[in-house]
């Protein structure tokens, strides 16, 4: 065992003597790569990140504005919907009122027309009754005037004897009771 340890110490010392590439000790390439990395990081941090952050902030602001606009539009839509419903309810009430008024006016017109027609019928009936009474009175007067001569003619035909009209008038008046 001891031989193995001394062998490894010997190998290390030989490596150090040859040029010393010890992996535990950083060499110049590492520092050069580190410097390039830091320079690239600084360039990206200075020139790339701020515009990207600006675009991201603008996009966040745009999203927030869009969300606010959507909420506002939804509220306006609900308000418009409520106004529409209210207007429709009012219009339905008004239409119902107009329909009821039209029905009432229609009934009134029908009743007025019916009353006017009944009045015209009554006046026509009264006119006809007066005309019939006048005609009846005229016919009655005519018959009263001619009853004596008609009675005499009828009696002459029935009896076969010539009867005088004056006698027929007296007998007709006594018979009728007037």
Swiss-Prot record:
One of its GO terms (molecular function) is proton-transporting ATP synthase activity, rotational mechanism. It is a single-pass membrane protein. InterPro entries: ATP_synth_B-like_membr_sf, ATP_synth_b/b'su_bac/chlpt, ATP_synthase_B_chain. The chain crosses the membrane at residues 30-50. Keywords: ATP synthesis, Cell membrane, CF(0), Hydrogen ion transport, Ion transport, Membrane, Transmembrane, Transmembrane helix, Transport. The keyword Transmembrane applies. It is found in: Cell membrane. GO terms for cellular component: plasma membrane; proton-transporting ATP synthase complex. It comes from the Bacteria. Belongs to the ATPase B chain family. PANTHER family: ATP SYNTHASE SUBUNIT B (PTHR33445:SF1), ATP SYNTHASE SUBUNIT B', CHLOROPLASTIC (PTHR33445). F-type ATPases have 2 components, F(1) - the catalytic core - and F(0) - the membrane proton channel. F(1) has five subunits: alpha(3), beta(3), gamma(1), delta(1), epsilon(1). F(0) has three main subunits: a(1), b(2) and c(10-14). The alpha and beta chains form an alternating ring which encloses part of the gamma chain. F(1) is attached to F(0) by a central stalk formed by the gamma and epsilon chains, while a peripheral stalk is formed by the delta and b chains. The lineage of its organism: Bacteria, Bacillati, Actinomycetota, Actinomycetes, Mycobacteriales. F(1)F(0) ATP synthase produces ATP from ADP in the presence of a proton or sodium gradient. F-type ATPases consist of two structural domains, F(1) containing the extramembraneous catalytic core and F(0) containing the membrane proton channel, linked together by a central stalk and a peripheral stalk. During catalysis, ATP synthesis in the catalytic domain of F(1) is coupled via a rotary mechanism of the central stalk subunits to proton translocation. This is ATP synthase subunit b.
């Amino acid at each position: 065992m001891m031989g193995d340890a001394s062998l490894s110490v010997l190998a290390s010392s030989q490596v150090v003597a040859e040029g010393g590439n010890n992996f535990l000790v950083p060499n110049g390439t590492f520092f050069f790569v580190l410097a390039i990395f830091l320079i690239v990081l600084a360039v990206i941090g200075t020139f790339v990140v701020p515009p990207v952050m600006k675009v991201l902030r603008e996009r966040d602001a745009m999203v927030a504005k869009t969300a606010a606009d959507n909420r506002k539009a939804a509220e306006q839509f609900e308000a418009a919907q409520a106004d529409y419903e209210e207007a429709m309810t009012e219009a339905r009430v008004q239409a119902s009122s107009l329909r009821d008024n039209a029905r009432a006016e229609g009934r009134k017109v029908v009743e007025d027309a019916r009353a006017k027609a009944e009045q015209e019928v009554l006046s026509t009936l009264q006119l006809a009754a007066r005309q019939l009474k006048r005609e009846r009175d005229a016919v009655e007067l005519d018959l009263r005037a001619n009853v004596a001569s008609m009675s005499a003619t009828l009696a002459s035909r029935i009896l076969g004897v010539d009867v005088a009209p004056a006698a027929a008038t007296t007998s007709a008046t006594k018979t009728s009771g007037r």
